Amino acid sequence: MGRARDSGKRSGGPPCSFLLLLLLSCGGGRGKSLLGAAGAQDFHIKVQVYENGDLSPLASAAVEIFGNQSSLASGVTDQDGVAVLGISYRLGTWVLVSATKRGFVTNSVPWRVDRLPLYASVSLYLVPERPATLILYEDIVQILLGSPGARSQPWVQFQRKAARLPRSSTYNQLTSSLTTASTRHQMRGFPAFIGTEPESANGGNTSWVELLPVAAISVHLFSGNGSEVHLSGPVQLSLPLPPESGLTTSSSVPAWRYEPKVGVWIRSGMGLVRRDGQQLYWSFVSPKLGYWAAAIPSSGRGMLSLMSGVDIAGYHTIFLLSILGALTLLVLILLCLLIYYCRRRCLKPRQQHHKLQLSGLSEPKRDQATSTSRLNLISTSHLDSTSTADSDLRTPVLRSAFSSREDFCKSGGRSSFQHSADTLPLRPGSRDEYPLKSARSGDLLESEDSKRGYGTGGKGQQRRRGGRGGVRDPPPSPPPLPPPFKHVIGDSKPPDYLMTQSADPLSRPTSLTQPGQFIFCGSIDHMKEGSYRHAMPTLVIPAHYMRLSSEENQGGQGEEQSESESGSTQVSHAHHFAPQDHAQRQQLLQQGHGYQQGATASSQDQEGKGWGNHGSVTIPVVFNESTMAQLNGELQALTEKKLLELGVKPHPRAWFVSLDGRSNAQVRHSYIDLQAGDKTRSNDASLDSGVDVNEIKVKLGPEERSGKAQLQPSNLTYSKLVFAEEGEQSLSESRTGGGCSPEDSSLTPLLDEGSETCLPMSRRGRSRGDSSRSSTSELRRDSMTSPDEDLNDQSEGGDDQDKKSPWQKREERPLMVFNVK
């Protein structure tokens, strides 16, 4: 028995535990339900249904309450149109109370309280449906309000085959109803416009949205027994819109369908607004008949825009396009800034390089003094010219007729070659003449042409005599430029630099010094190293200071002395015209000598002697202080001579010192005899001379006039050539005597400009008559200024006063003396 009991207890253990767990689960479920229902309270709502027209109560109307998209309670009205429904209500929640009856439009209202009332009553007013006009065609069925073809009326159209008729019904028994609403008062007869999304209606989130209706329609199709006919095909809806709707053509308005099972409007697509004449219509294709509305969600931002007459799609399109345009404009601005920045970065090195190239243009402007440099006047004297026929006709200094320096050199080279070949053999005073050559010092001393010109001086008289015969054969072609002149062709300075340099004759040369130049500057010790770093000092050395080894071997001393005394070699940096002109003139002069030599010798001698290499140039004189003083005096005389040739320009009446703080050791103070002679025109050489250089012009002889008539003036520029005439010694000697002081008489041979016995060499039409000089004058000038005679005088034991040249004595005179008598 005990075992049986124990076994029974053991066997009954599991069923007891199972029952216990079941009871606990049920108790938990009850507790959970009690907790869930703790917030809800039960109470009863009285619903009264009336007809909207005469406010008579409607009996047998179906009443239903919806909350949380589900039916909370339902009932039917009695004869008085009243129904009492009890619900479990949670304070603060929304519920929908609806009433439905056949032949009337379903109506519903939202209801909500925050405090539990003791009694609540809701009244609904149903609007009777309006019978519609039904037109049956073979293919379609139309439902209208009013007569067919009338405007501004709603209509519904569907396919005839889409209607599912009962077996006991025919098309002749079909009836329809069509009710529309477009105003706020009419909208109250339709169910409350509370919408939701399709996902919420199918059991999703319970979010309701308040709608703003534009138009609503209720359309139904009934059979003969009163049952509703369903359709299986699409239905076309067209509703007229009121003018105050604010919609525009092609605007899109959402379509909402009323669902009786949940009591809310469900979104079912999008309708389109179209215009027919002056009337707007909302068109939509629905899947079935029933309650449809064109409404806009009030919570959406698109509602306000659509109500103001702006399409929501167009609004968004314009908004997006505006954003895109702003972004595009921003990108363009950034791109322009990037291009501008890159352009500045790329052009900045070029601008710096351009500034480095044009830095020389600002150098002449640093010295703003009004003093005149005689070296510049000497080197630039070939730029000024006077016409032989008419002295009033002037030519400008700048040759602006040529677009570039290369064109000027090409045209100048051809013309100068032809003119020189024609005029050199025909000059009657060319026996004892030697050209005054001016070129770069390094180029002059190193060029083979210059050596060749001095080397052939021994036979120059024979060639000149042979040239008097008038035999004129075509001259040989000039040889190519020697190596020292090759850099002249490749000059890289721009034309604007030449224009600027020629426009400022007082400017210092800005090119760097070249190898082989003579550099001398009396005040270089007082200057800083950087002051003349970019300036090239210039030294002018007369020809009789230099000796050629070839002259000692080939020519006699008499001819060498006469040749060296007849001219001087000027070494300067010609910065007004391109150096090609000097190189071409050197070749032309040497070519002329070679041509006259070929008239008396064979072609082999002409090639061997005319263009052969000769000895180099030597300067036996030591450039000490006394020599430089004598050289300075000769340069002063040469300067005054050039100033006389440049008589077309008014000479400055004073010398001024540079204002930029630089010292000038060459400043001179002298006077001008303003009472010298009864002459109407003054040809003062300079303020330093103190003499009157007006002299009586000697008439031309018949031989000179005939030779002058044969030569025509040319408009091309050539270097200045000075010729000394042997036959005019008496004329020069007769003018040395005069009523001048010894100092003035020393200037007479240098300033003698009255001789016009030489034929003019055309240099822009300038006469060569004023440039002639007698041999006696040259010998007298050399006797006064030659360093050889100074050395002889020193060896003879002369006193210190005899060692000084007249120019040195003149420098020791009192300063700033005016009108001394």
Swiss-Prot record:
- The residues that the database entry marks as glycosylated are N68, N205, N225
Write the gene name: fam171a2
Q: From start to end residue, where is composition biased (Pro residues)?
A: 473-485
Q: What is the organism lineage in this UniProt record?
A: Eukaryota, Metazoa, Chordata, Craniata, Vertebrata
Q: List the biased-composition ranges (Basic and acidic residues).
A: 800-814
Provide the primary localization: membrane
Record region (Disordered): 411-512, 550-613, 727-821
Q: Which organism is it from?
A: Xenopus laevis (African clawed frog)
- From the Swiss-Prot or TrEMBL record, give the protein name: Protein FAM171A2
Pfam families documented for this protein:
FAM171A1-2-B_C, FAM171A1-2-B_N
